[in-house]
């Protein structure tokens, strides 16, 4: 609900995107990933399959996520 999903981003099978999220251009959300509410995924960021990203997180541009992210975290290169 009320999400922004930019061009050339990819959201794969069984991924769940929370409310009020922003998925930037070129981000790749792999299968079975859960993205919490009010989370920002930066341009070119990539998630490994089957991880969880908490509420109110910021994942910076180009970050490769390989494990779960707790709520209210900022992940950058």
PLM features per residue range, with description:
Residues 7, 16-20, 24-77:
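Glycine-rich hexapeptide-repeat left-handed beta-helix
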